[in-house]
Amino acid sequence: RSGSGKSTLASLFPRFYDAKRGVIKLDGIDINDFQLASLRQQIALVSQQVTLFNDTLRNNIAYGDLADIDDAEIMLAVQRAHADEFINAMPEGLDTIVGDDGVLLSGGQRQRIAIARALLKDAPVLIMDEATSALDNESEKHIQAALVEVMAGRTTLVIAHRLSTIESADVIVVLENGCIVEQGTHQQLLDRGAQYAKLHAAQFQDVPEPEDPTKPEPEPTSNPRLAPHGLFETS
């Protein structure tokens, strides 16, 4: 649910905020014992707010420590993020200028650029904070296929409202008002019939059928009535 603390929790791992209580460990080591730069080198973050520069697609994907990576590696990340189709269709390919804050790209394209960045970084920990929130259904299918490969061999934390993006997770954690109210696999949580199962039903089972425009309006009655993983540990 919105406001339950999901993104705040994800922000604690790279130490955008420091936890006031408890301990977060990475491979058994308190994250506060890492040099901040060293800790963040181990983490790739894809958030719902994608920051892009008024520069080429190439320089928006490979920058900072990755600026000297060759085009072959960049294109491999682009392909795995399923961004190659729209990049190849652009007039200058990787050399296309995207405008201020990526104004020339759609929301889904921006998200796939952010995912390509994370793939290129190849960090052992990947945090996806509503990373598919701006994708249409077709784009989401492409990204879901890519994520199966991307998640292999690394710890991945996925923050999601769209439950289709987390059904294959090893552990699903349900938060409410900053507290864990449920955790388990997708099937375990469905079988339990509690919060997760209700959210899942609301998204996938209780979608109203579209109205038939050819169906006549019902006749009014004489008396109308209103119807009623991982590497991270926390302690």
What is the predicted function of each stretch?
Residues R1-S235:
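ABC-type nucleotide-binding domain
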